[in-house]
């Protein structure tokens, strides 16, 4: 397995991203990263979870994902929703929602790592906001499934490279509550 850490955003890119989105200037000492290479989980579900936690504080993301593991709150599915069951989700604007438990557990481990990195750097964990989260396809592990009459079918096991970048922001721009479209039908 490759041990290199390929972040898709440099520190300058993160500083510009925070300035464009929140209107504050930060330094490179206020940025923390966590990277989990070659995780054996669904890439499509990882993309949806990464998209969902972007913009949340670290505490908000951890509490939401803990509820996903307990099957109390779902993750909205925005992109990969064709031929999916459209459950009667009680929130408008979410035609499809899922409970990706395995992916949520892996993201919780990654957010725990991110929180420890923030504490190590001396940042206030209550003001750490996730500014970038991404899931990229990793390498595929080839496998063979034996079939009847001496045949075999090849199938590949997918891996995912997950990265989360967060920044410590001033108190006035930290989101108090994550805004969701939670209007009851």
Curated annotation (Swiss-Prot):
The keyword Ribosomal protein applies. It comes from the Archaea. One of its GO terms (biological process) is cytoplasmic translation. This is Large ribosomal subunit protein uL22. InterPro entries: Ribosomal_uL22, Ribosomal_uL22_euk/arc, Ribosomal_uL22_sf. One of its GO terms (cellular component) is cytosolic large ribosomal subunit. Part of the 50S ribosomal subunit. PANTHER family: 60S RIBOSOMAL PROTEIN L17 (PTHR11593:SF10). Belongs to the universal ribosomal protein uL22 family. This protein binds specifically to 23S rRNA. It makes multiple contacts with different domains of the 23S rRNA in the assembled 50S subunit and ribosome. The globular domain of the protein is located near the polypeptide exit tunnel on the outside of the subunit, while an extended beta-hairpin is found that lines the wall of the exit tunnel in the center of the 70S ribosome. One of its GO terms (molecular function) is rRNA binding. Keywords: Ribonucleoprotein, Ribosomal protein, RNA-binding, rRNA-binding.
């Amino acid at each position: 397995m490759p041990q290199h850490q390929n972040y898709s955003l440099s520190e300058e890119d993160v500083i510009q991203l925070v300035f464009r989105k929140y209107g504050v200037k930060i330094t490179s000492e206020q940025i923390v990263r966590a990277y989990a290479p070659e995780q054996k989980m669904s890439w499509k579900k990882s993309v949806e979870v990464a998209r969902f936690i972007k913009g949340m504080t670290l505490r908000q993301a951890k509490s939401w994902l803990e509820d996903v593991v307990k099957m109390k709150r779902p993750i909205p599915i925005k992109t990969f929703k064709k031929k999916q069951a459209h459950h009667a989700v009680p929130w408008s604007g979410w035609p499809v929602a899922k409970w990706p438990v395995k992916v949520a557990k892996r993201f919780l481990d990654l957010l725990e790592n991110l929180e420890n990195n923030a504490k190590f750097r001396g940042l206030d964990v209550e003001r750490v906001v996730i500014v970038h989260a991404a899931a990229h396809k990793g390498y595929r592990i080839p496998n063979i499934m034996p079939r009847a009459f001496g045949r075999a079918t090849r199938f590949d096991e997918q891996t995912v490279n997950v990265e989360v970048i967060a920044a410590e922001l001033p108190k006035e721009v930290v989101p108090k509550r994550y805004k969701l479209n939670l209007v009851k039908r």
